[in-house]
Amino acid sequence: MASVLHSTLEAVENERNKLDTLFLHMSDGVVAYDGSGKLIHCNPAACELLGRTADECVYSELFESICPFSHVITMQRSDYVEGELTVGERSVELYFAPFSDEESGGVLIVLHDVTEQRKTEERRKEFVANVSHELRTPLTNVRSYAETIREAGDDLSRETENDFLDVVISETDRMTHIVQDLLTLSRLDSGRSEMNMARFPFSAAIDSVLRSTELEARRHKHELTHDYTENLPLIMGDRGRIEQVMLNVLSNAVKYTPDGGHIRVTAGSEGETVWMEVADDGIGIPEADRSRIFERFYRVDKARSRESGGTGLGLSIATEIVQRHHGSLTLVDRPGPGTTVRLELPITQPIGGEDSHE
């Protein structure tokens, strides 16, 4: 009998140790109170989520207003109540349940951090709102000008009619660009946009992009200069995508620098990394906007961006492409006016990374 009792106690102790280890290391918080509301368990995750020590986790202070203790303690064991608590900038989802139907039972609360989930939901809502806004404006213009042409009939001069049709074409082009950019982002987000990886000369890609922007730079009376050697390393990457990134950065400098400005392109290599910087002497980016310029649809100068046909998606697409290449696209802090954007890329790609699509 003694040996059986000893084995039983040992088994119970082992099970308790397993549970203690589980509660100790689980990412969700767990708090338990006895039937009188006294704390009997609080794991480290709960303390971290609540920003309190175990002794400070008083039910009446933390949870009573969300779900009264008297209500939870009288619920059936299979029932539970959901709630949510905000702790600083953190959103915590709560699940209340009794852990016994007996009077001597208590209340168990599971805490789950949903901060990132809530942020994702907000970004999704903002994204949908932005898409709706960006498409609504050109659609309204197209409808307005089309109705004017139809209603005016022969009273509209050929020159005016052509001007109106030019607006319609321009706005449909703008909607097409938005849809194309959205599809590109969707493919990048889902990983369905494969990179055609191959070795190519980094300097040759810069040369190609400079040739593509020379005419537009001259139209704005900009001085476009460059400083880099032709013997920069060959890099592994999708040349078309990398040139798309370079073109976006350089085109932004050309578009948003007041006419008659100076735009300078420099490039080089450091260890296993190549880099390119595009610096302009425009008005620069306000400090409050610097952390957001790579966000989708975010534009510092919305009016000018729309005038130039910008969708507000270019830099976010560029960032996605660069990240797929294990590189970085950043703003460089520098004194004085103007903006400097730096692109950094590894010369080789990690084994099993994007070069697996080569």
Provide a role label for each language-model segment.
Residues 327-328:
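Conserved glycine-rich
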Residues 260-272:
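Short beta-strand/loop element within the Bergerat-fold HATPase_c
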Residues 190-195, 234-237:
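Conserved micro-motifs of the catalytic ATP-binding
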Residues 202, 284-295:
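Short helix N-cap motif at coil->helix boundaries in the Bergerat
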Residues 170-175:
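Short alpha-helical segment of the dimerization/phosphotransfer core of two-component systems
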Residues 196-200, 218, 223-233:
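Conserved catalytic submotifs in the C-terminal HATPase_c
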Residues 55-116:
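PAS-family sensory/regulatory modules and their coupling/dimerization elements
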